[in-house]
Amino acid sequence: MFSGSNSYLGGNSGRQPPQQQPQQQQQYGGFQPNQGFQPQQTGFQPQQTGFQPQPTGYGNVAPLQPNFTGYPLQAQPTGYSQPPQSGFPGGQQQFNNAPQQQSFQTGAPPMPQIPQQFQQQPQQIQQAQPSPAAPVQQPQATGFAAMADSFKSASEPSKPRGRRASKGGAKIPSIRLSFITAQDQAKFETLFKSAVGDGQTLSGEKSRDLLLRSKLDGNSLSQIWTLADTTRSGQLHFPEFALAMYLCNLKLVGKSLPSVLPDQIKNEVSSMVDIINFAIEDDGPAGTNAPSFDSRQSTATPPTIQQPQPMPSNSALLTAQMTGFPGQQNNFSGGFQSQPTGFQSSMQTGFPGQQGGLQPQPTGFSQNMSNPQATGYTGPRPPMPPMPSNFSSNLSPAQTGMQGGMIAPLNSQPTGVPGQWGLVNAPATGLPNIDLLQSRMMPQQGREQGNFTTAGITGNAVIPWAVTKEEKTRYDSVFKAWDGFGKGFIGGDVAIEVFGQSGLEKPDLERIWTLSDHGNKGKLNMDEFAVAMHLIYRKLNGYPLPAQLPPELVPPSTRNFNDSIGAVKSLLHQESDFRKNSGATLLPQKTGLKKKVREKQVLLDAIDFKDENAADEDDALDRKDRREAEDLYRRIRRIQEDIDAHPDASLRNVDSGAERRAMKRQLQTLTDKLPDIASRVRRTERSIADAKLELFRLKDAKAHPGSASSIVGTGPGGAVTESDRLKARAKAMMQQRSAALTGKKIEISNDDLDAPKRLEEENLKIRTEKENNERMVQDVEESVRDFSRGLEDSLKDGGESSSSEHEKRRWEDGLGVEDEVKDFIFDLQRSSRSAKVRTDDRSREAPTETSRVSSAPAARSETPSSQPSSTPTPSAGTYSQYKTAEDRAAYIKQQAEQRMAERLAALGIRAPSKPGETTQQRLEREKNERAAKLKQAEEEDARREAERQARIAEEQGVAPHTPDQPKEITKKPPPPPSRKAARSDASERKFEEDRILKEQKSQIIATNELEDDAQRQENELAKEREAAQARVKALEEQMKAGKLKKEEEKKKRKALQAETKQQEARLAAQRAEIEAAQARERELQRQLEAIDDSDSSDDDEGPEQVTPQASTPTQGSQEFERKEASPPPPPPSVPVIVSPVPAAATTTSLPPPTPQVTSPVVSPPAETETRNPFLKKMAQSGDASAASTASNNPFHRLPSQELPAPAPIQVQPTGNRPSRVRPEEDDWDVVGSDKEDDSSDDEGPGAGGARHLASILFGTMGPPRPLSAMGNEATSAPHSPAAASPPVASPPPPPPMPSAGAPGGPPPPPPPPPPGMGAPPPPPMPPMGGAPAAPPAGGRPAGFLGEIQMGKALKKTQTKDKSAAATAGRVLD
């Protein structure tokens, strides 16, 4: 019927070269741009090319874009320039004044959409051509109003689309919100309407401006927005806005914002939001796939139109001729295909002379043309080669008219609506590389490696936006190949493999997935997969990916779903409007009420059935619970009977809390003593370390006389201070000066550098030992702490917590339980008490018989309160003897005391009482135990004291005095009773308890086993305590041994100090002699220089030379005083020593006369004794008292008695020389004795010796000083004796001599160190005795030098330890 004719005027013909434009204008010779033909009633407007378009379709046809005809140099728009409207209502067509009416109102067949890249080509081509502007085409008055409207330009404003079109302001339903008041809701409505204007929602910006006025912080406002925006649309409906204002009010009044909205508020807001959304009408037209130039956001640029190759000759081409105008078809030789456009019986349009209906009008090219056009549908049509126009819309020919004289409407061909998804034909140029792309996308081996590139599948072909049918077929086959299980979709992991085979970049594939996966489902169905593949194909051919999916690529499933939602909303809205306007909502609906009644009846029946089933189940559960409860009651009764029958049942009511608290207090008391003991041990360790260091210094000084260790440190901890170093340097300088005078070289020992090293090594050793002991103490302390913590934890673990106490009160007293359970508990208690009474009655006979046999009748006549004390320890039948509550309480208390005693005994503490005996027996036993312990303690103390005295005697080498020891022993109080007795008592009690338990029933066997376990634990604890006590005793023994060693070291130290003092005295004497010699040499020099002034010089030099007398012999004088204080025989020796004073004064020459010595000596010692408090006592007591005092001292008694013998030996050699220093020595002695009152015996001489050495050093450096320049110590007392001395001695030089002699006499050591007193004095005496023989051998200087040389032998026995005084003082402290 419609055999293969083209449906569109011009089809998809290509452009002709622009060079043909002048010829075409000549062919249309009378047509100017502003003229044209008159509008005819055919609905066609004059075309720019001179042809008038013909209606080739039906109404409701989508807009056809202008197609290009095959005329060279001129684009021939043969389609509609604007979308035609449906039908030809009332339209008339006039062809050469032959009006024909066509009125066909039929549905138009679907027509394919022209691709978007070709929709703007006519305008672009026409703009590029230099042709004059085309006249404005006016619509013809044919009555087609809809068609005229469709030809409006796209720039006209279009109505807003979507369901939220403004309809004169916000519509707020009259629904009351429960979370705000009516006044607040009215205010919020007013505010919302004023802010939102004509819309329905409040935008985010306006919402922010309103909410910021609340002056809340950003975090609160952010939380309020999150809670209020329930739809998550970024906009607020009125209920959401009211909710936001409500939350702001909550925050302003100080309340906290909820983290999640309450369900009631959330439901109200959501319901009101849904009502508002449904109330908005859907006014927008239905979606269409027609391309919109205004809304097009694709950045794709249409491909440039390539100019075709020029034709070889224009003669083969037919010139274009306007259709529908008479007189223009003469130039055509039948080259157009006839196209029926009306009734065949009508006149031919465009061909004069023809009558009778509309004749087919040629609208295309002749069949002999080489470039026919394709016009859309690929149905049955004659094969035609493609035109060289590079446009491949491939529109198929469609039947557009009627044939014959049929009056029926024209039938439409299936050409499709432009833009319809999946029904677009492939372009004329085909789809290049589509086969390669399909094969590449198919599942294949080796795809796991992912080495895919775009090589071989890229190109620059023209691809339409819509998916063509060929593409859809291929993409569906690829989809089915990958969807092996037939799920209808592929997941993301499969899509990664499929799309990755295309070789595109990852960002492009991600964008393609985002565009294809509508709704972000994470999977693609068949249509979405085709969209993704189409986008990949376009990307491979050089097209960029769009920002959003164009309408042509929206899958039908998605579009239909959205349309369905819109349709449902429209229906709901229409129904609600109808019911609201008609008032149907207010009228009751009978059918609805009946339906509800039936539904409720069904629900009630179901509830009744459910309740019956639940009741049956509850009954079954109740019966089961009752059986289980009864079974549990029976088991509890059996267990209670077993508990009552147990022999230790009477002990379960004992209050263990009091016992536990008492043990805690005792443990705390013992723990508190630990720090004090540890601190005492540490102090003892420090004192021992200091003593060891001092002892090493003394031994080192004795072993190395010339070593640097002779420097005694007087600083803290025995550190050597700067003053100590000055003293040592002064002493060394004195030695060097004396060596210079004698002419002998002093050998400096090499030990000076080794002394600090030895001291440091010893100090390190002592410190290491001290640290080891400290670690031991810390270990002991830590172990004791751990032990105490363990005991405390064990006591705590056994204690009752609040929860256990609550449970006890609940299940024993029946508090907080049901009545049935409470009755059961009381029943158990009653049965338990009755069982106890029965067992006590049965077991009373045996204990009563044993008690009658063992105890006296007086014990049986005791009151019930005293009976519990006589009853044996835990037994099953003893509790039944006591009927009253007082007796039972006393019995329980007695049992608790026994257990406490056992625990205390295990801890080593004496138990208060012993079980199984009366009070009188207990008192007698305790008395005997105390007596035995006291006797044992005394014996042990005596033994220890004897051992200590024996050790002391062995270390001292002297047997201890027997009369003194017993006194000390008896004076000492007896030590506390040892813990061994307590432990023995505990073991005895345990043994007796075991014996008593064996005599009772066989049921006690289990109790014995438990007690044995407890006993083993207690024994282990006792062993641990014994070990701890042994360690403590060992530490005590070490402390005692350390004390003994310290005492011995003190004694040795004192002896060494005495020796060093003697040696210092000898050294002082030698120094005095040296100074005297120097003074005499200076005096002789002065006498030689000034012979005339000899008398005056003698008077002046006298007192100057007295200064060395007072300054130098201090050590000797002090030692001499101490010597006098200790032994009785010193008086005869003292006069001999002092007598040389006048002799030396009278004789300036070398030999001092001895007879003059005796006269002045006696008086000064008396003054010295009266001024010294110690010497006063000695003088008052006399010789006998002195002897008795010496005998009372156990340490100095023997040496003091032996002193008289060596005294005369010392006096004889020294008596010749030193006599003049006597008064000065007395003065210094008094000062020294005053000092000794404040300081210890050891500190005095040490400090004095240092000062004397300094004074000697500085005295020898400068000229002699007068008496007025002396220290304060020698000013008061020495003046009187000094005055007496000058008249006796005429020359001043002799005073230094007596100083040399004076120290020679006092070498005997002071009383404190007796052991070394006798031995040291003799060695210095021989050189002193030999001294007088030397002077007469030569002249005066030679005599003095000879005496000094004779004293040189003293250096061999001299110890250069200067630390004696300071060290002794520190030890005494």
Curated annotation (Swiss-Prot):
Record-level GO BP terms: endocytosis; endosomal transport
Ranges of Acidic residues composition bias in the record: 1090-1103, 1224-1244
Biased composition (Pro residues): 1288-1335
Subcellular location, principal: membrane
Annotated EF-hand domain residues: 216-251, 504-539
SMART domains linked: EH
Biased composition (Low complexity): 1-59, 81-105, 114-141, 299-308, 348-359, 861-880, 1135-1149, 1156-1166, 1277-1287
Membrane topology: Peripheral membrane protein
Pfam name, any one: EH
PROSITE patterns in alphabetical order: EF_HAND_2, EH
Domain WH2: 1340-1357
Summary of the function given for this chain in its UniProt record: Component of the PAN1 actin cytoskeleton-regulatory complex required for the internalization of endosomes during actin-coupled endocytosis. The complex links the site of endocytosis to the cell membrane-associated actin cytoskeleton. Mediates uptake of external molecules and vacuolar degradation of plasma membrane proteins. Plays a role in the proper organization of the cell membrane-associated actin cytoskeleton and promotes its destabilization.
Protein family: Belongs to the PAN1 family.
PANTHER family: EH DOMAIN
UniProt protein name: Actin cytoskeleton-regulatory complex protein pan1
Organism: Sclerotinia sclerotiorum (strain ATCC 18683 / 1980 / Ss-1) (White mold)
